[in-house]
């Protein structure tokens, strides 16, 4: 399973003016390569617009989790967000197709599915007031745990991070006999330090950050 980062802009949320400031939120921690790419993008925007468009980045989840970002885009507090499929499924539930465990064996599988699904997903995003600006891949999702896990049964002894507010996945974990612990993603580190959780799944880039 591969996680995607996508950047969206709400229709008509930014008025036309001589100087436009685009407010963009992301979970990417400040100082990481991920954050650096957004800074570079902002510099390109500034150069291309002759300084009339400036990108203001809110990194590290300072304005909240991805669901908060989506909500704040809808009410115009921010204009864009670099989000994963977790945030996207809040807008268009069909993005949950990318969550299915072991459904994708390689990059070709991902590309083939995306080629078929993306036109309809983009249309549904636009119907909900969002525009896709960029689609990028950050890598495969892995499990990170406080002790070795070799089988799905081993994972049943762990306290598993789940995204706060994602009730459907929380119920699925519970129904399968696991122990989900809903948390905001910005609280993963403190949750690990206090023992509130001891396992989570993400891409290596985010885990190292």
Give names to the regions the model predicted.
Residues 4-12:
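Sec-dependent N-terminal signal peptides
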Residues 108-122:
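A gly/proline- and charged-residue-enriched helix-loop-helix capping module
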